[in-house]
């Protein structure tokens, strides 16, 4: 507590030696005293050291091949997209680590944010999560459909930054090197190429608001979220080194690509390549197609890296179920092993699960719910049936035509 100035005994700070008369407050500990000035100084020292630790971590960024190896352990397929992401992420953090020591005369490297285009359940969110985890940087996910421009009911774009700050345990320096994934970005596309005379609360206005933080600015973030209020204390965060990955399904964009490629054939006649109807038009997307879909040119310009993900087929989904380190089949096998039960899936059972996910158009994200439906009764009964040692999931049990096969001791 503060020293009493009315006594004859003068208390001095154990660190700087100043007396209680020379400072505003002295705090007493166990045979030690510290003044308010030394408290502030120590806070600054700790802050600087933490910032240096963050920068030190970034000097050891995994190379693109190493990042790809990590992604391959957890993500099935999407090889082109994974390579594009690995290169973009490596270049981003290399840019940060070298910009701190860059001379003014040297070339200034601009930030390369990423746009991922692919159908629902193709792995967009999981790819971003896996990258952030492998780099040990803060990560936040936001849904573009919940955002509105300032002055309208909804969530301010600055609240995206608050999620990242919270993921960094309110360490702003660490958050400034984090990754933000904004999903459903295609849902804030303009509803056509003609500019509407009415206010576009959730479309172009949100793109403009996102543009500011994506390209790099010092933003003021309410520490408790919500709308900003006058005289409210704010957290200042510089977004110039935050990597933004945005993703969306962009349903219908392949028709825009087909139209563009078809027009090219008409324009150049037989010298132009013939469009293969079975080809993946998603790999042919260019910025003009994205603009025609409804994203504004300025926004597209801040997303120079475009990674197109393909629709997952049955074989891809079966691999997702069984191959990765954290594959769903392995997870459920581990769950039942805690009860002393061995779990197995027939090959045609895996095919049935994958077929259901494709039928429901949920892709990889729908696999868990299908397994849960199949195994609900088993997971309810097994803990009480101590004589059961094996459970076998068949195609019939996945389709609801029979129960899983149990084997007892």
Curated annotation (Swiss-Prot):
Pfam families named among the record's database cross-references: AAA_2, ClpB_D2-small, zf-C4_ClpX
Molecular function (Gene Ontology), one example: zinc ion binding
Residues that hold ATP according to the record: 119-126
Ranges in a coiled coil: none
ClpX-type ZB domain span: 1-54
Database matches in CDD domains: RecA-like_ClpX
GO annotations of cellular component type: HslUV protease complex
Annotated function: ATP-dependent specificity component of the Clp protease. It directs the protease to specific substrates. Can perform chaperone functions in the absence of ClpP.
Protein name as annotated: ATP-dependent Clp protease ATP-binding subunit ClpX
Organism expressing this protein natively: Streptococcus uberis (strain ATCC BAA-854 / 0140J)
Origin organism lineage: Bacteria, Bacillati, Bacillota, Bacilli, Lactobacillales
């Amino acid at each position: 507590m503060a020293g009493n100035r009315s006594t004859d005994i003068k208390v001095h700070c154990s660190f700087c030696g100043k007396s209680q008369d020379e400072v505003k407050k002295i705090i007493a500990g166990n045979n030690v005293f510290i003044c308010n000035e030394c408290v502030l100084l120590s806070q600054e020292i700790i802050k600087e050291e933490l910032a240096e630790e963050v920068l030190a971590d970034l000097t050891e960024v995994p190379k693109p091949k190493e990042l790809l190896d990590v992604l391959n352990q957890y993500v099935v397929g999407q090889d082109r997209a994974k390579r594009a992401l690995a290169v973009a992420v490596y270049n981003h953090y290399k840019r940060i680590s070298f910009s701190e020591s860059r001379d003014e005369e040297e070339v200034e490297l601009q930030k390369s944010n990423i746009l991922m285009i692919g159908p629902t359940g193709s792995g967009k969110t999981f790819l971003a999560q896996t990258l952030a985890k492998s780099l040990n940087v803060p990560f936040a996910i936001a849904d573009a459909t919940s955002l509105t421009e300032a002055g309208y009911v909804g969530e301010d774009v600055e609240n995206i930054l608050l999620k990242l700050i919270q993921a960094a345990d309110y360490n702003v320096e660490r958050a400034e090197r984090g990754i933000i994934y904004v999903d459903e970005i295609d849902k804030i596309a303009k509803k056509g190429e003609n500019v509407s005379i009415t206010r576009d609360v959730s479309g172009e206005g949100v793109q403009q608001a996102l543009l500011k933080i994506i390209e790099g600015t010092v933003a003021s973030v309410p520490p408790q979220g919500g709308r900003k209020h006058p005289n409210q204390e704010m957290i200042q965060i510089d977004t110039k080194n935050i990597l933004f990955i945005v993703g969306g399904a962009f349903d219908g964009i392949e028709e825009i690509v087909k139209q563009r490629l078809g027009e090219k054939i008409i324009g150049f006649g037989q010298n132009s390549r013939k469009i293969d109807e079975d080809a993946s038009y998603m790999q042919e997307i260019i910025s003009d197609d994205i603009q025609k879909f409804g994203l504004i040119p300025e926004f597209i310009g801040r997303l120079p890296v475009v990674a197109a993900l393909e629709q997952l087929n049955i074989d891809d989904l079966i691999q997702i179920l069984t191959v990765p380190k954290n594959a769903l089949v392995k997870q459920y096998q581990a769950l039942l092993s805690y009860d002393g039960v061995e779990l197995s899936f027939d090959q045609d059972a895996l095919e049935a699960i994958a077929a259901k996910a494709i039928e429901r158009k949920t892709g990889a994200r729908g696999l868990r719910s299908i397994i849960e439906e199949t195994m609900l009764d088993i997971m309810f009964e097994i803990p009480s049936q101590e004589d059961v040692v094996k459970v076998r999931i068949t195609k019939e049990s996945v389709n609801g035509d029979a129960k899983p096969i149990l084997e007892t001791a």
